[in-house]
């Protein structure tokens, strides 16, 4: 055990006669690169624990289990190719390491507790199709945005995907989308706050877990959805259907008086049935003042409706439009000038 503990070595050649690497063999050493030969059939726990200079490791192709704490706190280890026969990743295996990208092998069945905990640079990962178990806190404190749980998963531990950072004393969840394929209900205290949760059509969510998600899609459909853009764009990781969508945008650029100015571009992934204007409130009740593009018949039938400018970008140039259709680019200008009376 601990054969090269704390040694100042950059590389090391393991002879072909070696069949076992004992517990903690290289931990706290300064090793940078190492190839483990195919003759090695047993690797014990904490082999490279706290090897802060380690950047490259080649593992034997016949390896089926990654030992516990093998690369714990290897801060310079950014990626590693795992053997295709690997079925289990041990507890704390990559905890607090520098891993930022990894392809999990298709045969992987078990990810033990705390396996990737604290890998703050890890933003995405694809779970393989035969995975059965994800241990508690396995991906906690990572930067994962979107995750899909395979239907084969039968066990998932608490806080497994509490993907947040706690810098400066505040907690920010990185998780945006969760796709849940198992037939059993989405459990409580597994995921950090997320915007979208996709479950099977007949799927269920633990009652105290529902509040963790802004929108829940059953069979890809949700009853109502609100989109508010503080910036210039929004994104959704997976195709969705909503029975009703409310889209809010604040137009504060000053226009001309009775003439357009301060144009904005807009592209929406859905047709727009109704436009309304509210000066302060953004409640989803569609009770604001009705709006319509110049040329829309609503301006002729509703005396309370207010006009705005709308042009579609076509292959031959901008053309005046009376409605917004899905996935088409438009220029839009809302009358916004102090010379207008307040609405």
Residue ranges of each PLM-predicted region?
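Consensus positions within tandem repeat domains that build extended binding/scaffold surfaces
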Residues: 1-5, 22-25, 44-49, 67-72, ...
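Structural signature of tandem-repeat unit edges
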Residues: 7-20, 29-42, 52-65, 75-88, ...
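Extracellular/lumenal glycan-associated surfaces
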Residues: 49, 117, 162-163, 327-335
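Predominantly extracellular/luminal carbohydrate-interaction, adhesion, and secreted-enzyme modules
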Residues: 159-162, 191
């Amino acid at each position: 055990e601990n054969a090269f503990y704390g040694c100042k070595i950059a590389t090391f050649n393991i002879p072909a006669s070696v069949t076992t690497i004992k517990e903690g063999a290289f931990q706290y050493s300064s090793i940078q690169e190492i190839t483990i030969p195919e003759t090695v059939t047993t690797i014990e726990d904490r082999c490279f624990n706290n090897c802060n200079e380690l950047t490259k490791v080649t593992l034997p192709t016949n390896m089926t289990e990654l030992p516990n704490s093998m690369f714990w706190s290897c801060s310079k280890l950014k990626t590693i190719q795992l053997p295709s026969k690997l079925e289990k990743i041990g507890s704390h295996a990559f905890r607090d390491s520098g891993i930022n990208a990894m392809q999990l092998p298709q045969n992987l069945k078990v990810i033990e507790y705390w396996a990737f905990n604290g890998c703050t640079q890890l933003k995405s990962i694809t779970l393989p199709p035969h995975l059965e178990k994800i241990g508690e806190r396995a991906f906690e404190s990572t930067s994962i945005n979107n995750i899909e749980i395979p239907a084969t998963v039968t066990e998932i531990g608490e806080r497994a995907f509490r993907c947040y950072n706690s810098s400066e004393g505040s907690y920010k969840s990185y998780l945006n989308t969760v796709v849940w394929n198992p037939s059993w209900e989405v459990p409580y205290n597994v995921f950090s706050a997320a915007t979208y949760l996709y479950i099977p059509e007949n799927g269920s969510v633990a009652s105290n877990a529902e509040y963790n998600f802004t929108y829940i899609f059953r069979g890809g459909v949700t009853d109502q959805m609100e989109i508010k853009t503080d910036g210039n764009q929004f994104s959704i990781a997976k195709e969705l259907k909503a029975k009703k969508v409310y889209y809010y945008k604040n137009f504060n650029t000053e226009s001309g008086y009775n003439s357009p100015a301060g144009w904005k571009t807009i592209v929406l992934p859905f047709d727009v049935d109704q436009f309304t204007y509210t000066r302060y409130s953004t409640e989803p009740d569609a009770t604001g003042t009705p709006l319509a593009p110049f040329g829309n018949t609503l301006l002729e039938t509703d005396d309370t409706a207010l006009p705005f400018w709308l042009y579609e970008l076509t292959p031959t140039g901008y053309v005046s439009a009376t409605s917004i259709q899905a996935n088409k680019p438009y220029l839009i200008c809302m009358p916004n000038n102090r010379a207008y009376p307040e609405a």
